[in-house]
Amino acid sequence: GLSFFRKNYDMLKNKKLAILCVGASPFENQAFNEVKARNLKEDLKNIPTFYGRGTWDEEKMSFKDRTLCKLLQKAIANKDPKTYEPWMKALMDAMGKKCDWTDKKYLKPLLEYIGN
């Protein structure tokens, strides 16, 4: 993950690097850029970054992640659904279900980058 890049950046900086982020939320450019700005500082901010939707399976989540998601769902449930951001809607729609949003199309930009 990112900790590997941080620890080994000097050794990797002359290589062709890429970061693939995976999440349950549908892609939203503003949110993606905010996450990148928060997590990719200094040298890492210049590494090409890609996004693909993954899966949602509460049974496979750690206790900590499952608890945090449930707390977040409870907080969002108090809002008017008309005001939900895309990630909020996705989170609420997934509640109590197993979801799989994986699609090979998410890999296309990454594979094109690697191929160049």
Question: Predicted segment positions?
Answer:
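FMN-binding flavodoxin-like domain, especially the glycine-rich phosphate-binding loop
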Residues: 1-116
